[in-house]
């Protein structure tokens, strides 16, 4: 078998390889644009050589992952933070990175991570695309609100009613401002049907998955949040306890404690930003419609600050959804979920 450590870049890859049977070692740089990398791996496939490739989790590598899967080669994806922690030398070059990856694979210390399936990744694009379009629509609506306010019209949400739209179009504006209004309204009209189509598609995908429907029984959690949660988390078996969910999503505070003094900073913001956003939004919706969540939110907001309370409730929601999914149970107001629910000595999940 040939073991290859790949330091991947968008335009090229630096590799270090070892053939176990012969002990042959080598290093090589392969370009992507001229097909050099693809020809190299296809040649290995034609020669019947078994290959295992290790690389850090990175972007812009989908084509490379598909190529290796097509050729039947084994691909290991590693956690960049853990790989960096295993570095001994102070030098950091592309060659050193490739050598480090190869050494970790040989010594069976390579920190492999879970990799979503192609279907999972494609469905994530659906959720992401809708989210980005909604953000674009919000920016367009804010610009139209600004145009109206500059003319002394503060209609807020009424601007999007049929009457508000008519009044906006009647405003006497200067030539370029009038053109801006017209083109923004045209963009808005084109985006609404697209967002509706994507929303319907996401709702249909949610109905196909029992675990998504189960998470939707929680107050404030709709099909988009539940679907995104299932797609991004992948499987609850990846995590030992609920606290790891908060760490994975990036909803825990960073810490720089020393000398017996605890110093907590802003949230780490590691992990998927879309899921982090959706959890915080869903937690606010739950606080509006559920008395228990409202009391907890108000309690936290009075102790600290509203922004901190929102993030804390988002983390709590992420933990609750994890245990609902892992234990296969629907939401129940009489059941409290903690970070160690279901473990020995904590049967009811209270913490």
Predicted regions: what they are:
Residues 128-214, 340-341:
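Glycine-rich, often acidic, oxyanion-interacting loops/wings at catalytic, nucleic-acid
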Residues 11-36:
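Short glycine-rich, Thr/Ser-proximal phosphate-binding strand/loop in the N-terminal lobe
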Residues 76-128, 132, 167-170, 261-271:
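Short alpha-helix plus adjacent loop in nuclease-associated cores
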Residues 54-63:
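Acidic, metal-coordinating catalytic cores used for nucleic-acid/nucleotide bond scission
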Residues 93, 214-217, 223, 227-307, ...:
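Phosphate-backbone recognition surface of nucleic-acid-processing proteins
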Residues 301-351:
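Basic, amphipathic alpha-helical segments enriched in Lys/Arg and hydrophobic/aromatic residues
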Residues 34-52:
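Short, basic/hydrophobic alpha-helical segments
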Residues 1-19, 101, 133:
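Gly/Thr-rich phosphate-binding beta-strand-loop-beta motif of the actin/hexokinase/Hsp70
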């Amino acid at each position: 078998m040939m073991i290859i450590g790949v330091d991947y870049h968008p335009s090229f890859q630096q590799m270090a390889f070892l053939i176990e049977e012969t002990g042959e070692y080598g290093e090589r740089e392969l370009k992507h644009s001229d097909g050099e990398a693809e020809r190299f791996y296809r040649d290995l496939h034609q020669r019947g050589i078994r290959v295992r490739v290790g690389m850090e989790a990175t972007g812009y590598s989908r084509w490379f992952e598909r190529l290796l899967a097509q050729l039947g080669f084994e691909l290991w994806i590693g956690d960049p933070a853990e790989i960096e922690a295993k570095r001994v030398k102070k030098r950091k070059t592309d060659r050193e990175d490739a050598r480090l990856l190869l050494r970790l694979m040989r010594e069976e210390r390579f920190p492999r991570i879970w990799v979503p399936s192609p279907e999972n990744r494609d469905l994530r694009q659906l959720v992401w695309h809708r989210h980005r379009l909604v953000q674009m629509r919000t920016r367009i609506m804010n610009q139209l609100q600004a145009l109206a306010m500059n003319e002394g019209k503060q209609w807020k949400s009424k601007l999007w009613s049929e009457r508000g739209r008519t009044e906006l179009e009647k405003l006497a504006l200067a030539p370029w401002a009038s053109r801006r209004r017209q083109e923004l309204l045209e963009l808005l009209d084109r985006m609404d049907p697209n967002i509706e189509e994507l929303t319907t598609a996401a709702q249909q995908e949610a109905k196909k998955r029992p675990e998504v429907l189960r998470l939707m029984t929680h107050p404030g959690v709709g099909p988009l949040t539940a679907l995104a949660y299932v797609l991004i988390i992948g499987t609850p078996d990846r995590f030992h306890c609920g606290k790891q969910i908060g760490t994975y999503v990036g909803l825990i505070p960073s810490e720089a404690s020393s000398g017996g003094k605890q110093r907590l900073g802003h949230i780490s913001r590691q992990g998927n930003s879309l899921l982090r956003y959706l959890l915080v939004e869903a937690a606010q919706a739950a606080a509006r419609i559920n008395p228990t969540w409202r009391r907890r939110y108000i309690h936290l907001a009075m102790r600290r600050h509203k922004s901190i309370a929102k993030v804390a409730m988002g983390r709590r929601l992420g933990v609750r959804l994890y245990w609902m999914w892992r234990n296969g149970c629907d939401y129940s107001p009489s059941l409290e979920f903690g970070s160690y629910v279901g473990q020995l000595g904590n049967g009811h999940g209270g913490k």
